Amino acid sequence: MEKVDKLKLKNDWKQRGYSFGVFRDPPGQVWANFVHKTDELVVLAEGEIQIEIEGRSHFPKIGEEQFIPAKALHTVRNTGRTYNVWYYGYKTILEFD
């Protein structure tokens, strides 16, 4: 299992115009039915996670980036038996048409 380089990821997201935050969730934790005005990125660092986006389930592996588009209904679940750690970032640079 490859470890996620937190500092490298944070710097990469900053370059791409995203914020950076960390969640550590207990087994069974559910963040249900969220919608944001901006795009979001999620990367699992430890444990297991399920990300449901507009009714479609994704099970990213550690280090795999998951994109959640702006205005998409989404739910995040810790599906494992241990705490998980995941990084999230919101698009901070506004793009104009």
Where are these regions (language model features)?
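Ligand-binding loop in jelly-roll beta-barrel domains
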Residues: 70-97
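Conserved short histidine dyad/triad with adjacent acidic residue
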Residues: 6, 19-36
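Short histidine-centered beta-strand/loop micro-motifs
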Residues: 10-12, 30-36, 77-79
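Short acidic-glycine-tyrosine-enriched beta hairpin
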Residues: 55-70
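A generic "binding-loop/recognition-motif" signal
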Residues: 27, 37, 56, 72-73, ...
